[in-house]
Amino acid sequence: MEQFLLSVGLLVCLVCLVKCVRFSRYLFLSFCKALPGSFLRSMGQWAVITGAGDGIGKAYSFELARHGLNVVLISRTLEKLQVISEEIERTTGSRVKVVQADFTREDIYDHIEEQLKGLEIGVLVNNVGMLPNLLPSHFLSTSGESQSVIHCNITSVVKMTQLVLKHMESRRRGLILNISSGVGVRPWPLYSLYSASKAFVCTFSKALNVEYRDKGIIIQVLTPYSVSTPMTKYLNTSRVTKTADEFVKESLKYVTIGAETCGCLAHEILAIILNLIPSRIFYSSTTQRFLLKQFSDYLKSNISNR
């Protein structure tokens, strides 16, 4: 019995040590300059960004272009993409290709594949997604959009990865960034469908990373919490709530840190705090009522009127 307890104690100490080492790497990288553009350019000439018309996708489009990559912008609204395309070309000198596609539909991927043909794609950012309810809501009150959420949040990641990964494999290099969410790390009641869809992205990404990391391909899932974007109704920014530009610039520092990252130091600290709460307590009725009130009040008081 004594030997067993000693083994358990050593295992716990080892887990804590690994977490401390990982967090120290975050601290170090957070104070470093951004990843050299040469690293991203070594992956290939082009970056493909889904959901590039707004928010995090738009920010990735500009930032990757600043690092010297040509960019393919894919989103639903052509007018937005054309404006962004002109600004990227004017300010960075990178080439831009625009592809109009509605990711809530299934019949778009042959068209996208045709548009990507012949491009040396080194970076794929699977960013497109939809949140059926910003304020906490029961599943049946949002289930009318369930098929659109599945297509946009899950099917898009699978299909776009299929289109691009096979070419990365043949060149033995590439970077795929899949944007999940902090609410995909553990089940979140009142965001059930969104949480489940983002959990798929987490599991899919981490499994793929194991399959393809020995082939020179980095596949990383990002699990941010609060980012001020059109999808979150432009939440007021703070030390925790980042602008899309802030989040993207910091996230690119961590592309070599491992298969999963929150994307910024503030969210990593928040994740550590949340993970300290035992599931039995987190999912208790009392805790859920408390979180529901606190989170609803926070959202209502911080949603911008932009």
UniProtKB/Swiss-Prot annotation:
EC number(s) reported in the record: 1.1.1.62, 1.1.1.64
Subcellular localization: Endoplasmic reticulum
Pfam families named among the record's database cross-references: adh_short
Entry binding sites for NADP(+): 44-73
GO biological process: androgen biosynthetic process; biphenyl metabolic process; cellular response to antibiotic; cellular response to gonadotropin stimulus; cellular response to hormone stimulus; hippocampus development; Leydig cell differentiation; organic acid metabolic process
Keyword vocabulary terms for this entry: Endoplasmic reticulum, Lipid biosynthesis, Lipid metabolism, NADP, Oxidoreductase, Steroid biosynthesis
UniProt GO cellular component terms: endoplasmic reticulum; endoplasmic reticulum membrane
Catalytic activity: a 17beta-hydroxy steroid + NADP(+) = a 17-oxo steroid + NADPH + H(+); testosterone + NADP(+) = androst-4-ene-3,17-dione + NADPH + H(+); 17beta-estradiol + NADP(+) = estrone + NADPH + H(+); 3beta-hydroxyandrost-5-en-17-one + NADPH + H(+) = androst-5-en-3beta,17beta-diol + NADP(+)
Enzyme class, broadest EC rank: oxidoreductase
CDD domains, A to Z: 17beta-HSD1_like_SDR_c (cd05356)
Metabolic or biological pathway: Hormone biosynthesis; testosterone biosynthesis; Steroid metabolism
Catalytic-site annotation from UniProt: Y194 (proton acceptor)
Role, per record: Catalyzes the conversion of 17-oxosteroids to 17beta-hydroxysteroids. Favors the reduction of androstenedione to testosterone. Testosterone is the key androgen driving male development and function. Uses NADPH while the two other EDH17B enzymes use NADH.
Family in the record: Belongs to the short-chain dehydrogenases/reductases (SDR) family. 17-beta-HSD 3 subfamily.
Protein name: 17-beta-hydroxysteroid dehydrogenase type 3
Annotated organism of origin: Rattus norvegicus
Gene this protein is translated from: Hsd17b3
